[in-house]
Curated annotation (Swiss-Prot):
Highly expressed in the bursa, very low expression in ovary and spleen. Expression was variable among B-cell lines. Highly expressed in immature B-cell lines such as DT40 and CL18, low expression was seen in relatively mature B-cell lines, such as 293B9 and 249L4. No expression was seen in T-cell lines. This is B-cell linker protein. GO terms for cellular component: cytoplasm; cytosol; plasma membrane. Residues 67-76, 277-295, 309-322, 368-382 have a biased composition (Basic and acidic residues). Functions as a central linker protein, downstream of the B-cell receptor (BCR), bridging the SYK kinase to a multitude of signaling pathways and regulating biological outcomes of B-cell function and development. Plays a role in the activation of ERK/EPHB2, MAP kinase p38 and JNK. Modulates AP1 activation. Important for the activation of NF-kappa-B and NFAT. Plays an important role in BCR-mediated PLCG1 and PLCG2 activation and Ca(2+) mobilization and is required for trafficking of the BCR to late endosomes. Residues 442-549 form the SH2 domain. One of its GO terms (molecular function) is lipase binding.
Length: 552
C-alpha cells in the first residue's frame, strides 16, 4: 500500500500540473480571442459611425447658398459675415437668420425688392419680344401693319425715340443697384402693356415699332415699279389691307388704259405662244410618229456592226470571222440600241426637218434590207418582203421588230458548239490546229460540261480524261481538261497566255508550267502525275492521264 501511495502522489501532482497548464493555455487563448474580437468590434463601430456620417452628408444635402445680390445692403454684409463664421459647423442656423433678415427687412422698405431679378429678366424679354413681333408675325398681323402706316408718316421721329427708351431701364439695372427698386414698381403695374419706361401716351409710339416701318415699305417697292402708281398709292393705304388689295387690282387696269402699248405687248404674245406651242406639239408628235425614228433606230446598228468586228478580227485575224461577226452581231445592237437613241434623234431631227420625211426612210430601209439577208442565212429569207412597206404605213410595227431580234442571238451562240456553219467550222479548225487538238482522240469538239461528266462517270476509271471547249467561250480560257479520279470529276481550265502564245493549267501562279500547245499538256501529264485539288473538301490527289474517253 505504501508503494502504491508513493506512486499515486506524484502521479496526482503531475495530473494537477497538467490541468493547470491546460487551464492557463485556455485562459491565454481566450484573452487573445477577446482582444481580437474587441478590436474588431471597435473597428466595425468606427466604420459604422463614419459610414453613417458620410451617408448623412450624402443624404441630407446642405441648403444651397444664396446668389450674390445686384444691390448693396447693410444686412447683406452682416449675413456674409454670419456665413463665414458658421459655415463650417451648421447650415441651418445661418439660413434661418439670413431668411429672416433677407425677406423681412426689404419687404418693410420695398416689397418689390425681393422680386427685382424677375422684372430685370422680363425687361430683357421685352426687347426681343418687340422685334420678333415685327419679324415673325408679319404674316398674321398684316392688317394691323397696313392700318398703322398713316400714323407713321406724321410721326417719323417718335419711333426712333421710343426704341432707346426701353433700353435705358435694362442697362442701368446692373449698374445702379440701390435706385432700381423704385422703377420695377411701374414695371410690375404695366407689364401687360409693355409701357414701362414711357408715359401713357407711348402706346402710339410702341405700336409703330411693333409694326416696323420696313414691312409697309416693302409692298410699295413692288408697286413703284411703274411711275403712274406713285400718285395713287400714298392715299389708299389708310383704311385697311382689303382696300390696299383692291387698289392693287385697280391700278393695273388704270395703267392699261393709260398705256395701251404694253397691254398689246402682253396680249399679242399670249395667243401667239399658244399657237406656237400647239404647232410645236403637233410637230413633235408628227416627228415621233414619223418613220424618222425608224430610220434612226435602223441606222444605229450600222456603226456597232463596224465596231464589234474589229475586236473579233484582232482576236482571230480571219476575214471569214469578220464576216461572221457582222452577221451574228447585227442582231445584238437593237437590244442595246435604246441607250443611244436620243443622240440619234437629235441628229436626225436637225438634219431631216428641211427635207421630206419619206426620203430618209427609203434610204435607211434599203440598208435594213441588207441586214435580213445576212441574218436570213440562218433563219430564211421570208422576212425580206414585209419590211419596206411597213415603215411608211405603220411605223409602230417596224419599232417592234428590232425588239424581237435580241432573242434570236441565243441560238447562234449555242450553235457555235453544236451546229457550226462553214465559217464557224473554219474558225474553230484554225484555232484547234493552233492549239494542237484538231482531230485528236481525246478532244470532244461538240461536247458540253454535262455530257463530258456523264461520259467520265460511265467510264468509272481513275485517270480517264478528255478535253472539251469551255462553256464560257472565252479566248483566254478556250479549253477545259476533264479528269475522273476517285469517283469525282475535276474540270481544270486551260488558259491561253496571249503575251507568249502559250497554254497553262488552272489559275495563274508563279513558277507554273507553260506549254506551246494543248497536245503538249496531255503528253506531259500522261507521263507525270497531275495534281487534283478539291476546294470543297480541301483535299489533294494526283493521277496521270491514262484512259481516253470519247463522247458519242
Amino acid at each position: 500500500m505504501d508503494k502504491l501511495n508513493k506512486l499515486a502522489v506524484p502521479a496526482g501532482e503531475k495530473f494537477r500540473k497538467l490541468q493547470k497548464m491546460v487551464h492557463d493555455i485556455k485562459k491565454n487563448e481566450s484573452g487573445i480571442i477577446n482582444k481580437f474580437k474587441k478590436f474588431q468590434n471597435e473597428q466595425v463601430a468606427l466604420i459604422c459611425k463614419t459610414g453613417k456620417d458620410t451617408w448623412d452628408r450624402l443624404k441630407k444635402k446642405p441648403p444651397p447658398s444664396l446668389p450674390r445680390r445686384d444691390y448693396a445692403s447693410e444686412h447683406a454684409d452682416n449675413e456674409e459675415e454670419q456665413w463665414s463664421d458658421d459655415f463650417d459647423s451648421d447650415y441651418e442656423n445661418p439660413d434661418g437668420h439670413s431668411d429672416s433678415e433677407m425677406y423681412v427687412v426689404p419687404s418693410e422698405e420695398n416689397p418689390d425688392d425681393s422680386y427685382e431679378p424677375p422684372p430685370s429678366e422680363q425687361e430683357k424679354k421685352k426687347i426681343p419680344s418687340s422685334f420678333p413681333i415685327s419679324r415673325g408675325e408679319y404674316a398674321d398681323n398684316r392688317t394691323s401693319h397696313h392700318q398703322l402706316p398713316p400714323i407713321n408718316k406724321p410721326l417719323p421721329s417718335t419711333p426712333s425715340s421710343a426704341l432707346p427708351r426701353p433700353k435705358k431701364p435694362s442697362l442701368p439695372s446692373p449698374a445702379a443697384k440701390p435706385k432700381l427698386p423704385l422703377k420695377p414698381r411701374e414695371c410690375s403695374d404695366d407689364e401687360d402693356n409693355y409701357i414701362v419706361p414711357v408715359d401713357n401716351d407711348d402706346d402710339n409710339y410702341i405700336e409703330p415699332t411693333e409694326s416696323s416701318t420696313p414691312p409697309p415699305a416693302k409692298p410699295p417697292v413692288n408697286r413703284f415699279m411703274k411711275p403712274p402708281a406713285k400718285s395713287a398709292l400714298p392715299t389708299p393705304p389708310k383704311p385697311s389691307l382689303a382696300s390696299d388689295m383692291q387698289e392693287v387690282y385697280e391700278v393695273p387696269e388704270e395703267e392699261e388704259e393709260l398705256s395701251p402699248p404694253p397691254v398689246t405687248r402682253f396680249t399679242k404674245p399670249l395667243p401667239a405662244t399658244r399657237a406656237q406651242n400647239a404647232e410645236h406639239s403637233h410637230m413633235h408628235s408628227m416627228t415621233r410618229e414619223s418613220p424618222k425614228l425608224d430610220a434612226s433606230r435602223n441606222i444605229l446598228p450600222l456603226p456597232r456592226n463596224r465596231l464589234h468586228p474589229k475586236t473579233d478580227h484582232e482576236a482571230n485575224n480571219n476575214d471569214e470571222n469578220h464576216s461572221f461577226s457582222n452577221t451574228q452581231e447585227s442582231k445584238f445592237p437593237p437590244g442595246a440600241a435604246p441607250s443611244p437613241l436620243p443622240r440619234a434623234l437629235k441628229k436626225t431631227s436637225n438634219a431631216v426637218n428641211p427635207a421630206k420625211p419619206c426620203l430618209p426612210s427609203r434610204d435607211t430601209f434599203t440598208v435594213n434590207e441588207d441586214k435580213p439577208t445576212a441574218a436570213d442565212r440562218r433563219r430564211g429569207s421570208s422576212h425580206e418582203f414585209p419590211l419596206p412597206p411597213l415603215p411608211s404605213g405603220t411605223p409602230k410595227s417596224s419599232l417592234q421588230k428590232p425588239l424581237v431580234l435580241p432573242k434570236v442571238p441565243e441560238a447562234p451562240s449555242r450553235a457555235l458548239g453544236t451546229s457550226p456553219h462553214s465559217s464557224i467550222s473554219s474558225i474553230s479548225s484554225t484555232a484547234d490546229q493552233d492549239a494542237g487538238v484538231h482531230s485528236k482522240a481525246w478532244y470532244a469538239a461538240t461536247c458540253d460540261r454535262k455530257t463530258a461528266e456523264d461520259a467520265l462517270y460511265r467510264s468509272n476509271k481513275d485517270g480517264s480524261f478528255l478535253i472539251r471547249k469551255s462553256s464560257g467561250q472565252d479566248s483566254r480560257q478556250p479549253y477545259t481538261l476533264v479528269v475522273f479520279y476517285n469517283r469525282r470529276v475535276y474540270n481544270i481550265p486551260i488558259r491561253f497566255i496571249e503575251s507568249t502564245r502559250q497554254y497553262a493549267l488552272g489559275r495563274e501562279k508563279c513558277g507554273e508550267e507553260r506549254f506551246d500547245s494543248v497536245a503538249e499538256i496531255v503528253e506531259n501529264h500522261q507521263h507525270t502525275s497531275l495534281v487534283l485539288i478539291d476546294s470543297q473538301n480541301n483535299t489533294k490527289d494526283s493521277t496521270k492521264l491514262k484512259y481516253i474517253v470519247r463522247v458519242s
